[in-house]
Amino acid sequence: MPQLPLLTPLGMLTLSEEDGAIVALDWGRGRDRTETPLLRRAADQLQDYFDGLRTGFDLPLNPTGSPFRRRVWDALRAIPAGETRSYGDLARSLGTASRAIGGANGANPIPIIIPCHRVVASGGAIGGYSGGDGVATKRWLLALERRARPAAPDDLLDAPTAGHDRPAPTP
């Protein structure tokens, strides 16, 4: 299986490809180093993500998992960067239990690209994270995405900038 190790701000990560799709993103260095066009594209997109230039990924993915887990992972990909959802919110939307959502999150073979870090406990508690340095990594990823998130028009309505709250001069 072609693999490509990457040095990132979170340490060494390894991308794996099988049959023309990304199948894993693992913490640490893989056993193989075979650069394919898809692995290079994925590595470039991850670099852009870490540089704050990208908030999502456009890659063929084929994570190994049950049909239920695949449904959860698809739901994770629909959570916008810079936002979070609770395990309970996802459970209600998928008609299942929060614990099942947590199990699917923990089994996610392509973290970051399938953004399981965007799921938090009820009440806003950060919850767990199985990758990297655990919760510290999850906090880092969420902070990165909040900084990279494009401003929404409503973000500007309540915060006038000094000097910009007066009318424009007339010609």
Locate each region found by the language model.
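Residue-level recognition of specific faces of alpha-helices
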Residues: A75-A78, I112, A125, W140
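Basic nucleic-acid-binding alpha-helical/helix-turn surface characteristic of O6-alkylguanine DNA
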Residues: M1-T96, L144-P171
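Mobile beta-alpha loop/short-helix "lid" or hinge segments that flank ligand
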Residues: I22, I112-I113, V119
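Major-groove DNA-recognition helix of helix-turn-helix-type DNA-binding domains
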Residues: A104-N105, P109-I114
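Intrinsically disordered, low-complexity basic tails/linkers immediately adjacent to helix-turn-helix/homeobox/MYB/SANT
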Residues: V119-L141, A148
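Active-site and channel-lining beta-strand-loop segments
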Residues: L13-L15, H117-A121
